[in-house]
């Protein structure tokens, strides 16, 4: 009998405290980019019972009503009742945003490659906003080329939110978490779901029996394909027995604390940098999107079944200091050839990434819950597979 291989990933709903913070930060970023596409933004948010603090650094010509953006975001998530302990109408909003450090701006606005040079490539003008390493990943486990555990975990909490907002399950409240354990065979292919954990905030008047029944019938059975479920699959639904107090009333939330939820559920490595509240000159965000774009196109081109791409940058320098492609033995060509193709086809300078993926637009609030990668419900440029032919042509020419 072969040994079981299990892998687990989690997700959280848009009403989770950390995700409220992420969405507020990205809503502020979008509001600024609507007026000033060249703005530099690093907006952080902290939420807790009755209060929201927004702080960070920005350089922009835009005027944004932070108070209005915060309250609208909270209302759209669903915190619209005083009994939740955190509501759009009554929450205190405390903004504290200052101008970006001129020392940092110097390197971002004029990259090392062009300082003192008379001949300048416009795409060399923007240096990386910080040093760092970023990873992108793709695998052929799902149609969107994502690991199955995180894909299912996102879908479960998204389904809970849809049922709440549509009014089908009126007792649901905004905060929720999911966790999915998938069993893999000896060839690392997913064969079944071993366990599902769902914790969802609810009104005090619903019974546990009703909640369990609804979550299994309307969420789990609707989201997880039946061939992954069997009589050995374990369901843990609100295992504490009660989840009435939630959101910022139950736990404080902070921007950037769900970086594994935002990416690949732990299935791939992570460079450590968060995304939300940051404009695209911050390579923590833009280069992570570029790395996903590269990895997804490589798998879509049938050049590998599983790919991890690492990029790394120095602050104030446009060109990446390293590019690495790892196919985990699934590639049909040498990794050195893939790396050469990546360098030829994808412009990985910050300005090149911004142009390639059109990242000066206000598209970020929609990414701040249910994952930045593998989304099928919204059109994100780094999820497109429009470089497949270019990759195939490059490899054929070798």
From Swiss-Prot:
Pathway(s) where this gene product acts: Amino-acid biosynthesis; S-adenosyl-L-methionine biosynthesis; S-adenosyl-L-methionine from L-methionine: step 1/1
Binding site for L-methionine: 57, 100, 251, 282
Gene Ontology MF term list: ATP binding; magnesium ion binding; methionine adenosyltransferase activity
Pfam family, one: S-AdoMet_synt_N
GO CC, one annotated term: cytoplasm
Binding site for ATP: 16, 175-177, 242-243, 251, 257-258, 274, 278
Chain residue ranges for the region called Flexible loop: 100-110
UniProt-listed Gene3D superfamilies: 3.30.300.10
Residue positions binding Mg(2+): 18
Keywords, ordered alphabetically: ATP-binding, Cytoplasm, Magnesium, Metal-binding, Nucleotide-binding, One-carbon metabolism, Potassium, Transferase
Similarity remark: Belongs to the AdoMet synthase family.
NCBIfam families membership: metK
PANTHER family in the record: S-ADENOSYLMETHIONINE SYNTHETASE
Protein name, entry field: S-adenosylmethionine synthase
Species of the source: Streptococcus agalactiae serotype III (strain NEM316)
Gene that this sequence comes from: metK
């Amino acid at each position: 009998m072969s040994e079981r291989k299990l892998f687990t990933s989690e997700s959280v709903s848009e009403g989770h405290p950390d995700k409220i913070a992420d969405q507020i930060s990205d809503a502020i970023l979008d509001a600024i980019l609507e007026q000033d596409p060249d703005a530099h933004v690093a907006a952080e948010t902290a939420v807790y019972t009755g209060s929201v603090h927004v702080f960070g650094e920005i350089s922009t010509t835009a005027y944004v009503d932070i108070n209005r953006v915060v309250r609208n975001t909270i209302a759209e998530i669903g915190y619209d009742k005083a009994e939740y302990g955190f509501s759009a109408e009554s929450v205190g909003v405390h903004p504290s945003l200052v101008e970006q450090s001129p020392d940092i701006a110097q390197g971002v606005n004029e990259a090392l490659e062009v300082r003192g040079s008379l001949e300048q490539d416009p795409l060399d003008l923007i240096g990386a906003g910080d040093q760092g390493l970023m990873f992108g990943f793709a695998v052929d486990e799902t149609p969107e080329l994502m690991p199955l555990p995180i894909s299912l975990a996102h879908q479960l909490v998204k389904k809970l939110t849809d049922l709440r907002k549509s009014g089908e399950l009126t007792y649901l409240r905004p905060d929720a978490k999911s966790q999915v354990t998938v069993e893999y065979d000896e060839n690392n292919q997913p064969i079944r779901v071993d366990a599902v954990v769902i914790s969802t905030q609810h009104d005090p008047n619903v019974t546990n029996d009703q909640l369990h029944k609804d979550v299994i019938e309307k969420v789990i059975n609707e989201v997880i394909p039946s061939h992954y479920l069997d009589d050995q699959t374990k369901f843990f639904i609100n295992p504490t027995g009660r989840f009435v107090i939630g959101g910022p009333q139950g736990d404080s939330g902070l921007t950037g604390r769900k970086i594994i939820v935002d990416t690949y559920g732990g299935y791939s490595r992570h460079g450590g940098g968060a995304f939300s509240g940051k404009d695209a000159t911050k390579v923590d965000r833009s280069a992570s999107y570029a790395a996903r774009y590269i990895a997804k196109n490589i798998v879509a081109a049938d050049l590998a079944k599983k790919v991890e791409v690492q990029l790394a940058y120095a602050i104030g320098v446009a060109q990446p200091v390293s590019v690495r492609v790892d196919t985990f033995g699934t590639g049909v060509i040498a990794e050195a050839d893939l790396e050469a193709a990546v360098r030829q086809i994808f412009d990985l300078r910050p300005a090149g990434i911004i142009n390639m993926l059109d990242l000066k637009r206000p598209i970020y609030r929609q990414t701040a819950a249910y994952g930045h990668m593998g989304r099928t419900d919204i059109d994100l440029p780094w999820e497109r597979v429009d470089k497949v032919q270019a990759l195939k042509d490059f490899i054929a020419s070798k």
